[in-house]
Amino acid sequence: MKTLGEFIIEKQAEYPEAKGELSGILSSIRLAAKIIHREINRAGLSQDILGVAGSENIQGEAQMKLDVFANETMKKALLAREEVAGFASEEDDNFVAFENDRAKNAKYILMTDPLDGSSNIDVNVSVGTIFSIYKRVSPIGSPVTMEDFLQEGRKQVASGYVTYGSSTMLVYTTGNGVNGFTYDPSLGLFILSHPDMKMPTEGKYYSINEGQYVTFPMGVKKFIKYCQESDEATKRPYSSRYIGSLVSDFHRNLLKGGIYIYPTSTVYPKGKLRLLYEGNPMAFLAEQAGGMATDGFNPILDIKPSELHQRVPFFVGSTSMVKQADKFMQECAE
């Protein structure tokens, strides 16, 4: 039995030049995940932490009370260790520069969707936390700048998510494979339960909000029809599974094989998901597990961000399924 802490130390020892900053950040995320896990498990017993907070994020979306709690928990956990120079969240209008001397000398910045799928909390459906870590590009010792956050996803040094469901799991990569750890609340420890995770090349699930079908581009409509057709050679029809929480849908497809799609639409002409907080971290995980992630045409990780809350169409999952979806998109664009 190997704990997350032991695994982090073991991996750090493989890099003699490492000074432990990244390990410290992962430990901060581990602590935040435990606190968020505890609060989510109390949600049904305390109305104080359920429902709408009465505020909106920069996207104009109503913030749930647990959105605000998870965001502040992540921020405080990172501030306590002073291993990151700056922090950006889907829930905040702008990035936060950590101004104390040690933080200003830190090498890394972190971006997060602190509680993905939070609208599901009231009905006891799985939610998650997504995170993404980069090396800063601004001079060490100075406050972070916008350029530190507007980096291509290919430059991530680590990304991951925590899924709060029937069990709580932390899944992450540092660019050398994907590993999953299940939380044992009786011990207060994350235990390595899913070493070297691989996404099946072929899948049998497609995850998309079909209630929005009439708003989708033709390429997506044709792919949905393809998924529903019978064909023994490709083991179709595929099964439709859509939870409404990116982390939950992605996690199932990582284990079982499948594709998750949130495309452009007449309602969201640029897509709905955020490139920096959702697209890049999940795309990095997918590629590290042998999967694929695109915007329907090009790899997500190659997109150069132009703004902090940039939206993106998102196709992620088993390689064969993403390639097939991209093929329909490209044919309909010609």
From Swiss-Prot:
Cofactor binding: number and manner: Binds 2 magnesium ions per subunit.
Name of protein: Fructose-1,6-bisphosphatase class 1
Signal peptide interval: none
Chain positions recorded as substrate binding sites: 116-119, 209, 242, 272
GO molecular function, one term: fructose 1,6-bisphosphate 1-phosphatase activity
Main localization, broad class: cytoplasm
The protein's annotated pathway: Carbohydrate biosynthesis; gluconeogenesis
Keywords, alphabetical: Carbohydrate metabolism, Cytoplasm, Hydrolase, Magnesium, Metal-binding
Catalytically driven reaction(s): beta-D-fructose 1,6-bisphosphate + H2O = beta-D-fructose 6-phosphate + phosphate
Broadest EC class assigned to this enzyme: hydrolase
Organism: Actinobacillus pleuropneumoniae serotype 3 (strain JL03)
Positions with a binding annotation for Mg(2+) 1: 90, 113, 115
